[in-house]
C-alpha cells in the first residue's frame, strides 16, 4: 500500500490538501506496529501518520483505523492525553475534508478516496462525532453513520446517545456474526411486524415461503427478530415431539423485554402461528408426508427487563438470541423457553449499575460488529475495483445473498 504523507493538518490550506498525494511511502505490517508503539508514547507525528493510513480502503487502512479506534474506546489514565491528540487529528481531517468537498454528508460528491471514509459508516466517523459539539450536526452524521436505508431513524437520532434504539442493520450485523457457525439454531433477518399497507405480517410471509420450499421445515430452532412498531421482540419457532402423545408440534416462544405486548399484537402473532400450523399440515399432506401435527403451543414470555433501560429492546433481543444460540451449540436439546426464561431471571438479579454496564458493553460489541461490516465491505470493494482495473474481460457478474 502506498500512502500520502499528510501532517500538521491544521496548517494545510485546501490547495495544499489537494496536493498531498505527491509524497508517498510504502506501508508494511512492521511499520504499522512501530507507529502504534510510538503513538502510544505520545508522538503526534505517528498519530497523524496512522490517520493517513487509516483513510485507505485496503487491509492496512482498516488495521490503522482499528488501532486508533481501540485506543480511543479503551481509555486508561496513561492514554488520556493520547486520546485527546487522536480526536483532535480526526476532527481536523474532517473539517478539512468538509471544506474541500463543500458537503460533510455526501461522499459521492468527491471521487477522492481521501475523503470518502470520513463521510460513510466508519470507525473514524465515530471518533469525529464524539468531538463535534453541535447536536444538530451529530444528528446529521448519525443518518449517514447508521446508513438509514429503512428510514427507521427520527430526525433527532444521535448515534452517540448511549440510550438510543438499535437499528435493523445493527441487529442484523450482530446476529449474523454470532450465528455464522451455529448448527442447531438459525437466525432470520430482522423485519417489521406488518407488511406496509396490508394486514399481512412479514413473519407469515417468511414462514410460508420456507415450507413451500421444504415441507419438512423447520429442522432446527428458528429465531425471528421482529419490530412491532418502536419495539423489538424475539420469536422462537421449533418443531418438537410432544411427549404426551408422541406427535409433532410447533412450539413458539415470543420473548418480550417489556411487561406486556398489547392485545392486538399478541392476537396477530397467535393468528400467524396458527395459520402457519395449518399451512404446514397442508404442505406435508401434499408431499405425502404422513405425520399429524398437534395444535401449536404459543408462549408469551414477558420478561419485564427494561425498568432501567427504556430504549434497550434491540439489545435485549440480541443478547437473548445469543443465549439461545450458544447454549444450544453446547446442548442441542436445550429448550428455547427454558434458556430465555433463565436468561431473563439472571439479568433481573443484577443491580441497576450492573445492568447499565451489561447494556453498555453489549452496545459496544454491537457497534464494533456493525462498523466492521462496513470496513470489510470497503476492503472487498477496494480489491474488486483493483481486479477490474487490471483485468481484461469486459463482462463480469456478481451476486449478493443475505442469509
Swiss-Prot record:
Active site: 231, 313 (nucleophile)
Annotated InterPro entries: ElaD/SseL-like_N, Papain-like_cys_pep_sf, Peptidase_C48_C
Sorted UniProt keywords: Hydrolase, Protease, Thiol protease
EC numbers, comma separated: 3.4.22.-
SUPFAM superfamilies tied to this protein: Cysteine proteinases
Superkingdom, taxonomy of origin: Bacteria
GO MF assignments: cysteine-type peptidase activity; deSUMOylase activity
Gene3D superfamilies named in the record: Adenoviral Proteinase, Chain A
One BP annotation, GO: protein deubiquitination
Ranges in coiled-coil conformation: none
S-S pairs: none
Pfam short name (any one): Peptidase_C48
Family of the protein in this entry: Belongs to the peptidase C79 family.
Its job: Protease that can act as an efficient and specific deubiquitinating enzyme in vitro. Does not possess desumoylating and deneddylating activities. The physiological substrate is unknown.
NCBIfam families for the chain: PRK11836.1
Protein name (Swiss-Prot/TrEMBL): Protease ElaD
Protein source organism: Escherichia coli (strain K12)
Amino acid at each position: 500500500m502506498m500512502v500520502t504523507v499528510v501532517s500538521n493538518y491544521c496548517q494545510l490550506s485546501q490547495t495544499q490538501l489537494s496536493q498531498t498525494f505527491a509524497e508517498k511511502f510504502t506501508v508494511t505490517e512492521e511499520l504499522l506496529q512501530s507507529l502504534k508503539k510510538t503513538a502510544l508514547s505520545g508522538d503526534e507525528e505517528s498519530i497523524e501518520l496512522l490517520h493517513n493510513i487509516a483513510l485507505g480502503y485496503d487491509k492496512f487502512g482498516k488495521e490503522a483505523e482499528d488501532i486508533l479506534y481501540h485506543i480511543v474506546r479503551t481509555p486508561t489514565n496513561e492514554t488520556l492525553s493520547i486520546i485527546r491528540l487522536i480526536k483532535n487529528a480526526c476532527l481536523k481531517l474532517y473539517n478539512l475534508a468538509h471544506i474541500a468537498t463543500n458537503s460533510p454528508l455526501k461522499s459521492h460528491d468527491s471521487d477522492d478516496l481521501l475523503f470518502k471514509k470520513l463521510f460513510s459508516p466508519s470507525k473514524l466517523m465515530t471518533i469525529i462525532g464524539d468531538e463535534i459539539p453541535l447536536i444538530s450536526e451529530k444528528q446529521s452524521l448519525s443518518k449517514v453513520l447508521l446508513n438509514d436505508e429503512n428510514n427507521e431513524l427520527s430526525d433527532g437520532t444521535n448515534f452517540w446517545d448511549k440510550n438510543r434504539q438499535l437499528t435493523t442493520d445493527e441487529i442484523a450485523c450482530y446476529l449474523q456474526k454470532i450465528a455464522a457457525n451455529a448448527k442447531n439454531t438459525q437466525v432470520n433477518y430482522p423485519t417489521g411486524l406488518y407488511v406496509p399497507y396490508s394486514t399481512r405480517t412479514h413473519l407469515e410471509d417468511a414462514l410460508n415461503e420456507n415450507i413451500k420450499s421444504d415441507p419438512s421445515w423447520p429442522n432446527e430452532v428458528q429465531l425471528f427478530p421482529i419490530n412491532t412498531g418502536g419495539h423489538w421482540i424475539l420469536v422462537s419457532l421449533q418443531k418438537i415431539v410432544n411427549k404426551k402423545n408422541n406427535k409433532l408440534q410447533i412450539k413458539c416462544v415470543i420473548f418480550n423485554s417489556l411487561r406486556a405486548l398489547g392485545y392486538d399484537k399478541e392476537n396477530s402473532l397467535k393468528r400467524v402461528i396458527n395459520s402457519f400450523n395449518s399451512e404446514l399440515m397442508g404442505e406435508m399432506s401434499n408431499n405425502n408426508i404422513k405425520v399429524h401435527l398437534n395444535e401449536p403451543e404459543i408462549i408469551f414470555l414477558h420478561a419485564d427487563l427494561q425498568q432501567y433501560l427504556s430504549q434497550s429492546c434491540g439489545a435485549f433481543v440480541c443478547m437473548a438470541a445469543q443465549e439461545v444460540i450458544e447454549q444450544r451449540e453446547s446442548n442441542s436439546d436445550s429448550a428455547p423457553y427454558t434458556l430465555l426464561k433463565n436468561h431473563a431471571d439472571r439479568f433481573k438479579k443484577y443491580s441497576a449499575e450492573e445492568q447499565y454496564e451489561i447494556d453498555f458493553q453489549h452496545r459496544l460489541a454491537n457497534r464494533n460488529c456493525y462498523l466492521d461490516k462496513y470496513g470489510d465491505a470497503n476492503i472487498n470493494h477496494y480489491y474488486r475495483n483493483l481486479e477490474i482495473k487490471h483485468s481484461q474481460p469486459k463482462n463480469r457478474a456478481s451476486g449478493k445473498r443475505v442469509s
